[in-house]
Swiss-Prot record:
Domain Peptidase M12B: 197-392
UniProt cofactor(s): Zn(2+)
Binding site for Zn(2+): H333, H337, H343
Keywords for this protein: Calcium, Cell adhesion impairing toxin, Disulfide bond, Hemostasis impairing toxin, Hydrolase, Metal-binding, Metalloprotease, Platelet aggregation inhibiting toxin, Protease, Secreted, Signal, Toxin, Zinc, Zymogen
Motif Cell attachment site positions after renumbering to this chain: 459-461
Family: Belongs to the venom metalloproteinase (M12B) family. P-II subfamily. P-IIa sub-subfamily.
Cell compartment(s), UniProt: Secreted
Gene source species: Protobothrops jerdonii
Cofactor binding note from Swiss-Prot or TrEMBL: Binds 1 zinc ion per subunit.
Enzyme Commission code: 3.4.24.-
GO molecular function, one term: toxin activity
Complexes and interactors: Monomer.
CDD domains the record matches: ZnMc_adamalysin_II_like
Annotated protein name in UniProt: Zinc metalloproteinase/disintegrin
Length: 481
């Protein structure tokens, strides 16, 4: 009886000590079980939101204490973020979910100046953090003990197959269409190397990927949100803010012919974006996530220097790994191409595993090489891409007028859903006589606020956002006049 009991205990303990386990991120060779403890920053009696703006977690890795400082990524979703899927008869079903209180955070490790972190706190902690130069991943263990998490190095995730995975871009591309010259904007001295830029991102999921995840829209949404959170964090060193503007899931059938030849699929997707997607909602760059096996070892493709072009500001990426972070690196890689970046030359760039490496490395990096930064600076200087100058505004939605949907539609000067708004004529959806505006952070009593009036306090090193005196919208980063 005692022997049987001992065997039972060993079997129960083994998952906590094991050297191999199958996780969402793949089959992991070596991992450590940790129990993150949340350090509450809210005062006693305060009402706690579902996901706090700032959080701190403590746990141990290799016996050493690790303290994660996390902040909510407040710019991750546009104010009019939308999700679209399709009915069996082909009708579009578009919703505008509230995503203000989301669970996606970025941050750093205490007392590690070079550390970074990108963590989803939706159901436990899932994401990655850089600690003492090493990339670690963390995710909850599906055990009865709900506090248990697995922490493991990226290099300990087994490859799903032995074939090298690479980007299919082999040559440069230059648009025949000139990109509109940027207007002069105020830039602080600190922003001169990499001025603040904003990319409104549209993600389209093909039917193959939708069925891959059991035709479960919630699974797709969660995975895409995690990807975009990672992309945003990787683009931050370039002073680029990534904002998810829309998610379009081809739930019934593909709306283009998704082909094994990645450049062909990208071309068809670019045509569809120009013809259909941009007419529904303005955005700067679109990516097609697919489950198709591209020819050869290709997992992604994008036009070099295509950003802000209606047809060429696109990329196509295979959902090639169960590990969200790995796919997010590929998506960031294709955005890099659109921003003028070529592949890293291993002899010149001295970065074996940076984001723009042509082949995925066992030592996955989330950094852009100096070569990539130079390419990006050249692209900004020579092409002056206008579409990424400003943060997303409410008026980026384009659709037929529908009163009272809380968005400014084509043909409307104001949203006329509320008869209590004195600035908007409920019968015509036009501004009331004498009114300049009906709502917005720079609208006060139907008039534009004065130029220079603070409309959004600064976060981090950016300046306060101030009204222009010419609009009800609050521009990002004090870029006015």
């Amino acid at each position: 009886m005692i022997q049987v009991l001992l065997v039972t205990i060993c079997l129960a303990v083994f998952p906590y000590q094991g050297s191999s386990i199958i996780l969402e991120s793949g089959n992991v060779d070596d991992y450590e079980v940790v129990y993150p403890q949340k350090v509450t920053a809210l005062p006693k009696g305060a009402v706690q939101p579902k996901y706090e703006d700032a959080m701190q977690y403590e746990f141990k890795v290799n016996g050493e204490p690790v303290v994660l400082h996390l902040e909510k990524n407040k710019g991750l979703f546009s104010e009019d973020y939308s999700e679209t899927h399709y009915s069996p008869d082909g009708r579009e079903i578009t919703t505008y979910p509230s995503v203000e209180d989301h669970c996606y955070h970025h941050g750093r490790v205490h007392n590690d100046a070079d550390s970074t972190a990108s963590i989803s706190a939706c159901d436990g902690l899932k994401g990655h953090f850089k600690l003492q130069g090493e990339m670690y991943l963390i995710e909850p263990l599906e055990l009865s003990d709900s506090e248990a998490h697995a922490v493991f190095k990226y290099e300990n995730v087994e490859k799903e197959d032995e074939a090298p995975k690479m980007c299919g871009v082999t040559q440069n591309w230059e648009s025949d269409e000139s990109i509109k010259k940027a207007s002069q904007l105020y830039l602080t001295p600190e922003q001169q190397r990499f001025p603040q830029r904003h990319i409104e991102l549209a993600i389209v999921v093909d039917h193959g990927m939708y069925t891959k995840y059991s035709s479960n829209f919630k699974k797709i949404r969660k995975r895409v949100h995690q990807m975009v959170s990672n992309i945003n964090e990787m683009c931050r060193p370039l002073n680029i803010a990534i904002t998810l503007s829309l998610l379009d899931v081809w739930s019934e059938k593909d709306l283009i012919t998704v082909q094994a030849d990645a450049p062909t699929t990208a071309g068809l997707f670019g045509d569809w974006r120009e013809r259909v997607l941009l007419k529904k909602k303005n955005h700067d760059h679109a990516q097609l996530l697919t489950d198709i096996n591209f020819t050869g070892d290709t997992i992604g493709w994008a036009y070099v220097g295509g950003m802000c072009n209606a047809k060429y500001s696109v990329g196509t990426v295979k959902d090639h790994s169960s590990n969200v972070f790995v796919v997010a690196v590929t998506m960031t890689h294709e955005i890099g191409h659109n921003l003028g970046m070529e592949h890293d030359d291993k002899d010149k760039c001295k970065c074996e595993a940076c984001i723009m490496a042509p082949v995925i490395s066992d030592k996955q990096s989330k950094l852009f090489s100096d070569c990539s930064k130079d390419y990006y600076q050249t692209f900004l200087t020579n092409k002056k891409p206008q579409c990424i100058l400003n943060a997303p505004l409410r008026t980026d939605t384009v659709s037929t007028p529908i009163s009272g949907n809380e968005f400014l539609e084509a043909g409307e000067e104001c949203d006329c859903g509320s008869p209590s708004n004195p600035c908007c004529d409920v019968g015509t959806c036009k501004l009331s006589p004498g009114a300049q505006c009906a709502d917005g952070l720079c609208c006060d009593q139907c008039r534009f606020k004065k130029k220079g009036k603070i409309c959004r306090r600064a976060r981090g090193d950016n300046p306060d956002d101030r009204c222009t005196g010419q609009s009800a919208d609050c521009p990002r980063n004090g870029l006015y006049g």
